[in-house]
Amino acid sequence: MTDWSAVLTGFVVILVLGLVGLVVPGIGQLAAGLLGGLVAGYLAGGGLARGFWHGLLAGAFGGILLGAILFVLLTVAGFLVGPIGGVFGGLAGTSAFVIAVTLAAIAAIDSAVGGAVGGLLA
């Protein structure tokens, strides 16, 4: 079972450290992802795999939200055009969601590694 409080806490850590990394050189986005994933994995506990999963979700959370929003917008826009537009809007929305989630998961690999370490430390 996913511990969403751990995922959201890790996401907030990534967000805050990412913003700090824009202003203060040396911290960077990679460190933000690693530390946010570490926090998510540590809070979730349960070992390597559970920490990896929670770190991955924390790192990919923004992309997953974007994909869900694109899915809804494209599907609704398609239905506004008509029945055929609804079919194409649904296909476009589903495609956008799958692409966004896939890219978010790839970009969140550093967070997943941090989460695995955090899961081991917990």
What are these regions (language model features)?
Residues 1-58, 64-122:
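Juxtamembrane/disordered regions of integral membrane proteins
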